[in-house]
């Protein structure tokens, strides 16, 4: 048993979590009230990774939902899954973070930190061999940026040897919900750089485009977006939850994908992403799926991987897949001139193969398919996300616009400059890692640059 605790922070994290847990229940044969559905339970599944079993045979998610104000959590308490969640594992405050990192990190959020950590300790004490934590949040809002950063910092102290993998929603190039999103994002990323182990970067614009172009949804809403996120999370964690011929655990993700602690921001992709109506026209063989996950249109963040180089990637196949087909498909990808790899990384691929077919919910736009492929990749093109974010930060900070809102919550103004300099160093790190010269790479490390 290798348990994972899921933490959902703020509106984005909690709403994504609702969809994730609906799908996890369907995959593991668990009803909305937590009872086991013997007819749909899969014999290869280890639901104890994500669920604890109570004394009456009821299964409870190993999760925690936290928000600084109650409305989003209250909607979960009144949802059709209200009996699934343990009431003590839904924590709310009385006032929100008002889209302000400093409120989530220094004032309102700080007051909720101890009760949150105490509850996490109790959940961890109920685990026999805790693998680590999955954290769902957005860095654009105040709670998802400020409180999530504060909690991840504390987890590094309380659980120093446990892997922390976050699904982090970044502001979209064209979609902004708050004028201070660039501040929140830079300040939060500055903290994640030091304290998080793996950050899977998502952005709403990329997922909107997937909904429109791939799933043929003309006007996608957050529920549609969260369906895409939940399918991606399911595919990434499949080998953690089901037995297979080639399985990958959380620590292997970290070992294989993260060459230096700071370089832990990942792209993710999934194939096939097709609507129910189009399912009849797609072959979806292993070679096609493998090629598709390297396409920019299938990436969950707005950047072009062909502008960068792959440092490493994990490919997770599930369903009707033969190992030899996977080997042939990977060889084919390696031979493509438009997919580049850094020459200093000895092994670019980690493979997971699992026989469990993908599951789709009845209200999902996704077609039911026989096989799928998901990829988490470390590609230097992810720096495009940070470049856009930094440019927007600079426009605001040049005028010191809205800075007083943060300073009035106990934050030092110098933290803005410190965080921005750290992000500039991160951009430089990715530029240097894309260098083809091993000698240049060696010299970069000798000079004591920021990759440590």
Curated annotation (Swiss-Prot):
Gene3D superfamilies, sorted: Helix hairpin bin, Tubulin/FtsZ, C-terminal domain, Tubulin/FtsZ, GTPase domain
GO biological process, one term: microtubule-based process
Cofactor(s) listed: Mg(2+)
Binding locations of GTP: 11, 69, 138, 142-143, 177, 204, 226
GO cellular component, one term: cytoplasm
Role, per record: Tubulin is the major constituent of microtubules, a cylinder consisting of laterally associated linear protofilaments composed of alpha- and beta-tubulin heterodimers. Microtubules grow by the addition of GTP-tubulin dimers to the microtubule end, where a stabilizing cap forms. Below the cap, tubulin dimers are in GDP-bound state, owing to GTPase activity of alpha-tubulin.
Protein name per the record: Tubulin alpha-6 chain
Gene it is expressed from: TUBA6
């Amino acid at each position: 048993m290798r348990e994972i605790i899921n933490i959902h922070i703020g509106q984005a994290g909690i709403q994504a979590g609702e969809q994730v847990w609906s799908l996890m229940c369907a995959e593991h044969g668990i009803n909305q009230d937590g009872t086991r559905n013997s007819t749909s339970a899969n014999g290869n599944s280890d639901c104890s990774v994500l669920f604890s079993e109570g004394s009456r045979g009821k299964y409870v998610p190993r999760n925690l939902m936290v928000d600084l104000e109650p409305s989003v959590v209250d909607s979960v308490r009144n949802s059709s899954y209200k009996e699934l969640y343990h009431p003590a594992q839904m924590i709310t405050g009385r006032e929100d973070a008002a889209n302000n990192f400093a409120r989530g990190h220094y004032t309102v959020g700080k007051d909720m930190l101890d009760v949150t950590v105490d509850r996490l300790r109790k959940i961890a004490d109920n685990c026999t061999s805790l693998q680590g934590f999955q954290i769902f949040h957005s860095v654009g809002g105040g709670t998802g940026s400020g409180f999530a950063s504060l909690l991840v910092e504390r987890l590094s102290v309380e659980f120093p040897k446990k892997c922390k993998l976050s699904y982090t929603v970044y502001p979209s190039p064209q979609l902004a919900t708050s004028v201070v999103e660039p501040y929140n994002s830079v300040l939060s990323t500055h903290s994640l750089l030091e304290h998080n182990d793996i950050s899977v970067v998502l952005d709403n614009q990329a997922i909107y485009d997937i909904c429109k172009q791939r799933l043929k949804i003309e006007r996608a809403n957050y529920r549609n977006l969260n369906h895409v996120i939940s399918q991606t999370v399911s595919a990434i964690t499949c080998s953690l939850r089901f037995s297979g011929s080639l399985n990958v655990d959380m620590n292997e993700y970290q070992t294989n994908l993260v060459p230096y602690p700071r370089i832990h921001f990942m792209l993710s992709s999934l194939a096939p992403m097709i609507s129910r109506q189009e399912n009849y026209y797609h072959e979806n063989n292993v070679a096609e799926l493998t090629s598709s996950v390297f396409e920019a249109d299938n990436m969950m963040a707005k950047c072009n991987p062909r502008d960068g180089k792959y440092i490493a990637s994990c490919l997770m196949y599930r369903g009707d897949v033969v190992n030899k087909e996977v080997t042939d498909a990977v060889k084919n990808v390696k031979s493509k001139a438009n997919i580049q790899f850094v020459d200093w990384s000895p092994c670019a691929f980690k493979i997971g193969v699992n026989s469990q077919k993908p599951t789709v919910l009845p209200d999902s736009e996704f077609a039911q398919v026989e096989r799928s492929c998901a990829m988490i990749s470390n590609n230097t093109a992810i720096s495009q996300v940070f470049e856009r974010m930094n440019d927007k930060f600079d426009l605001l900070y040049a005028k010191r616009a809205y800075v007083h809102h943060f300073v009035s919550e106990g934050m030092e103004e110098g933290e803005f400059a410190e965080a921005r300099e750290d992000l500039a160093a991160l951009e430089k790190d990715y530029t240097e890692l894309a260098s083809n010269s091993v000698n240049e790479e060696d010299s970069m490390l000798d000079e004591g640059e920021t990759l440590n």
